[in-house]
């Protein structure tokens, strides 16, 4: 039985989204239990034999500063949910709340794995191969060193190995060009570290990739700093929404375009389903000594259910142990990288 702790109060919509998503998730996963954390009255919206309610008196808002969430709101639904993981009561925690607060609280309570300096946020983006490309970091670390990018690559490889059943997932380093000479000093050094990792057998490194490679499916994993990754994620979601809106507008122009829309509906529906970012909701906070997943703050019930499913799959497939094992195997490489003088 897999047990997930859910921050029911987080995100833009709170229980209005999280509870319907939890109800739907339970219907499809008979071997799962949920610990719902939030206000007492709010939690009454979902009573189930495989649900436990844990009352929390505070809520971390989307505008709360990290210090407020971490130091002052010690009985927040977000913190109490993560505490369930620390105490061994839940296999994973899920929240749609404030990203900075979630990362800070998770790092404070769970700590990082040996050999990992900073956790990273990883999620999937759809690609032209009919699958998905895993990208990290997506906003946890705005500024990164080359050593951090190497650590992200190691953890991302473990994630893809577990969730996509790939023995040797292919890693790419996001850059402004494929050539080795391109990029800033951090990227150039990271490229060198990743090539060394490939030679030692710790990683399957493709080389530098560009932004379009994320969607072409050139590699399984794209590594970047959190600033670039977050911009790429939000830009892709914006483009997908723009395309959907443009198609709807054009097919609604007159009777003939409406008829064309009816004829083309099966194809258009399949395409839009592949591009629907809600299907890829649920980002893993990698590098912690416990499983924590972040949902979009604006997620609807369908999207939040996907985050629950990702957390469930990660727990069922022992993601934490496999990340820990891969990091331990790469420990000499990571230690050697940290020991190198700054360029």
Swiss-Prot record:
Pathway: Lipid metabolism; phospholipid metabolism. It is an enzyme of class 2 (transferase). It comes from the Bacteria. Gene3D superfamilies: Isopropylmalate Dehydrogenase. Its EC number is 2.3.1.274. Keywords: Cytoplasm, Lipid biosynthesis, Lipid metabolism, Phospholipid biosynthesis, Phospholipid metabolism, Transferase. Homodimer. Probably interacts with PlsY. Catalyzes the reversible formation of acyl-phosphate (acyl-PO(4)) from acyl-[acyl-carrier-protein] (acyl-ACP). This enzyme utilizes acyl-ACP as fatty acyl donor, but not acyl-CoA. HAMAP family: PlsX. This is Phosphate acyltransferase. The lineage of its organism: Bacteria, Pseudomonadati, Pseudomonadota, Betaproteobacteria, Burkholderiales. The gene is plsX.
């Amino acid at each position: 039985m897999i047990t997930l702790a859910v921050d029911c109060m987080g995100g833009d919509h709170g229980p209005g989204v999280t509870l319907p998503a939890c109800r739907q998730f339970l219907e499809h996963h008979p071997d799962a239990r949920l610990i719902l954390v939030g206000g007492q009255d709010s939690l009454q919206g979902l009573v189930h034999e495989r649900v436990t309610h844990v009352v929390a008196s505070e809520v971390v808002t989307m505008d709360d500063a990290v210090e407020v969430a971490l130091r002052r709101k010690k009985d927040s639904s977000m913190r109490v949910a993560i505490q369930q993981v620390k105490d061994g009561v839940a296999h994973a925690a899920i929240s749609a709340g404030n990203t900075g607060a979630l990362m800070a609280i998770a790092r404070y309570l769970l700590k990082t794995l040996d050999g990992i300096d900073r956790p990273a946020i990883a999620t999937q983006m759809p690609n032209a191969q009919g699958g998905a490309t895993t990208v990290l970091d997506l906003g946890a670390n705005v500024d990164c060193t080359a050593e951090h990018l190497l650590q992200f690559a190691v953890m991302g490889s473990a994630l893809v190995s577990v969730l996509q059943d790939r023995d040797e997932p292919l890693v790419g380093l996001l850059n402004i060009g494929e050539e080795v000479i391109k990029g800033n000093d951090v990227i150039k050094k990271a490229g060198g570290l990743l090539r060394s990792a490939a030679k030692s057998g710790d990683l399957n490194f493709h080389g530098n990739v560009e932004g379009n490679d994320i969607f072409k499916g050139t590699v399984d994993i794209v590594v970047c700093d959190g600033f670039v990754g977050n911009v790429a994620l939000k830009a892709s979601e914006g483009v997908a929404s723009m395309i959907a809106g443009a198609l709807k507008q054009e097919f609604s122009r007159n009777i003939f375009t409406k008829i064309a829309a009816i004829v083309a509906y099966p194809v258009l529906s399949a395409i839009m389903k592949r591009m629907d970012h809600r299907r890829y909701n649920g980002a893993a906070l990698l590098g912690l000594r416990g499983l924590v997943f972040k949902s979009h703050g604006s997620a609807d019930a369908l999207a939040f259910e996907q985050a629950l499913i990702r957390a469930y799959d990660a727990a069922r497939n022992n993601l934490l142990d496999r990340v820990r094992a891969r990091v331990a195997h790469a420990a000499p490489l990571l230690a050697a990288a940290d020991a190198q003088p700054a360029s």
